[in-house]
Amino acid sequence: MTDSIAATINTRANVYFDGKCVSHGITLADGTKKSVGVILPATLTFNTGAPEVMETVAGSCSIKLAGSDSWQSYGPGERFDVPGQSSFEIKVEGEPYHYICHFG
């Protein structure tokens, strides 16, 4: 899938968790910030500053929000919300998980 948009792309990758998560930051013409990335099979914990919406592009994952005891699963075309100043665990098994993260 490809989209044509007016944006500035940070061509230097953000590499986290010894390369298990790699993303690129994008700033749209209106100042909106996003990142596009991939998470390889692993269970990782992310902290958030601003609220985030994680949009699944390919692959699947299970997530557990801070304060929750239950895991929720998401696949292509599905999204989940993460509150700001919080955290979430994400579990990827099998195929890599491709995502778009919408900030704010």
UniProtKB/Swiss-Prot annotation:
It catalyses: a purine D-ribonucleoside + phosphate = a purine nucleobase + alpha-D-ribose 1-phosphate; adenosine + phosphate = alpha-D-ribose 1-phosphate + adenine; cytidine + phosphate = cytosine + alpha-D-ribose 1-phosphate; guanosine + phosphate = alpha-D-ribose 1-phosphate + guanine. The keyword Lipid metabolism does not apply. It holds the Pfam family Ppnp. One of its GO terms (molecular function) is purine-nucleoside phosphorylase activity. Keywords: Glycosyltransferase, Transferase. It is an enzyme of class 2 (transferase). Belongs to the nucleoside phosphorylase PpnP family. This is Pyrimidine/purine nucleoside phosphorylase. It comes from Leptothrix cholodnii (strain ATCC 51168 / LMG 8142 / SP-6) (Leptothrix discophora (strain SP-6)). The lineage of its organism: Bacteria, Pseudomonadati, Pseudomonadota, Betaproteobacteria, Burkholderiales.
